[in-house]
């Protein structure tokens, strides 16, 4: 399973570890992903999503119905 947020599209980024001597080695920055389930009252069911903490805040702000409508419009199967 890929490390991608279903709502925001956040994914793994790459960069460098930089030591005190300024040596650089490659590293990955992983998104803060969680499998969360949200109650959708209009459909009377739970929906499981793999979301970042940023996406959880977005869902709290806009509502799960609006977020699901956006996902379905973009072709995501939910």
UniProtKB/Swiss-Prot annotation:
GO terms for cellular component: cytosolic large ribosomal subunit. InterPro entries: Ribosomal_bL28 (IPR026569), Ribosomal_bL28/bL31-like_sf (IPR034704), Ribosomal_bL28_bact-type (IPR001383), Ribosomal_bL28_sf (IPR037147). Keywords: Ribonucleoprotein, Ribosomal protein. GO terms for molecular function: structural constituent of ribosome. One of its GO terms (biological process) is translation. It holds the Pfam family Ribosomal_L28. Gene3D superfamilies: Ribosomal protein L28/L24. Belongs to the bacterial ribosomal protein bL28 family. This is Large ribosomal subunit protein bL28. The lineage of its organism: Bacteria, Pseudomonadati, Pseudomonadota, Gammaproteobacteria, Lysobacterales.
